[in-house]
Amino acid sequence: MEEFQGHIELDRSWQHNFFYPLIFQEYIYAFAYDHGLNKSILLENSGDKKYSLLIVKRLITRMSQQNHLILSANDSNQNEIFGHKNKKKLYSEMITEGFAVIVEIPFSLLLISSLEGKEIVKSHNLRSIHSIFPFLEDKFLHLNYVLDILIPYPAHLEILVQTLRYWLKDASSLHFLRFFLYEYRNWNSLITQKEFISFLKKRNQRLFLFLYNFHVCEYESLFVFLRNQSSYLRSTSFGALLERIHFYGKIKYLVKVFTNDLGVIQWFFKEPFPHYVRYQGKSILASKGTFFLMHKWKYYIIYFWQCNFSVWSQPRKIYINRLSNHSLDFMGFFSSVRLNSSVIRSQLLENSFLIENIIKKFDTIVPIIPLVGSLAKAKFCNVLGHPVSKSVWADLSDSDIIDRFGRICRNLSHYYSGSSRKKSLYRIKYILRLSCARTLSRKHKSTVRSFLKRLGSEFLEEFFTEEEKVLSLILPRDSSTSWGLYKRRIWYLDIICIHKLVNDE
């Protein structure tokens, strides 16, 4: 983000949030090439990684003309331009990639300024998704019910633009965005969740991910405030509070009402405070309250989506579960609150007593069946979990094959290091090790047994994490201390995303 600040002049148009002129700047496309998710669009050919300034100059020249967005049929049928057969598709992808970089600028600057104001130096630690689990472990032991929520996708692309317009006041940029969204889909039709996911995978991922993430963050900014002020919204019609334009003025009015109503303040302390956590399109809302209270929260959220974002969600997308007897499928773990009972014998003179203590423990379990399904889909094993050779990797060198398998195994071990039961993880490691051995033996046309015998223990070391290597050198395998360290849960602050095998849907 510091690179942007060095290139962008803070002139009058920038101060008034006019971002449209930036689409004509060459350095924007250079940043899009460096940071974009689809880097191939700015390459002169598929085998060359050199950034093509010539393509960008042609694009900017064409956009500066009166008919910059009109491409004739002959343009699409011309010869290849730097490896791309369709010039219209190439230009569209380049513009949307650059536009995605532009709309990210103000929000990145807001993030940097907020972190500097709070004197937070190592902000990357706050991005670790593993930091959620210590929070759940600390809070969930004292809670009763949880709402398992699937955040609905917007039913129309115009909703995304309408949400963005309250922050981005440049009308030209919004019209520009509408134009390209119209190119992707008929503007007058609705979209389903499956079609929206298809957009994210097949189209400009950076732009659509930004629009969806901004849509979710805007929903959360309103919902979290209303959740915090839920004590005095019971006697107030919340439908009138959700108009976004005058929302901040209504916040001041609500605070004034709150300070003047002592009866409502007394009721506030009786209301169990819910805890809210989200990752991607799934969120959870947990509370110490009763089932009736969670039922009210469920329909409150549904009406909240309808009134404020024109999103109609079915009640079956929100589940009410009791933490004591349900596992929560969240971020690749099965999490639950388990009751451990311990019986203590107490002797008092001639009488003895049995005292049963119940201790709550937060369990995080590796979901073995979904993981095996993901491995089967990736052709590492069959549907029953029996390892098979990865035939598409058989043409690689031995070191590349071992490195690829070992990297997947280490990444999964790293992510699931916080699991309270690691036996399932050992099975996943076994599948990957044997699949690697089968791939190598297939390449060299030998048996798996003879190949493993020839490689020896050096082959298995590639599948160990750094922590396991250190422990194996310091402590013997059969010691109780070593076994206790292997079983201990460890949460890391350097994990910012879920492995694709964990998050495969």
From Swiss-Prot:
GO terms for cellular component: chloroplast. Pfam families: Intron_maturas2, MatK_N. GO terms for molecular function: RNA binding. It is found in: Plastid, Chloroplast. The keyword RNA-binding applies. Keywords: Chloroplast, mRNA processing, Plastid, RNA-binding, tRNA processing. It comes from the Eukaryota. InterPro entries: Domain_X (IPR024937), Maturase_MatK (IPR002866), Maturase_MatK_N (IPR024942). Signal peptide: none annotated. GO terms for biological process: mRNA processing; RNA splicing; tRNA processing. Belongs to the intron maturase 2 family. MatK subfamily. Usually encoded in the trnK tRNA gene intron. Probably assists in splicing its own and other chloroplast group II introns. This is Maturase K. It comes from Beta vulgaris (Sugar beet).
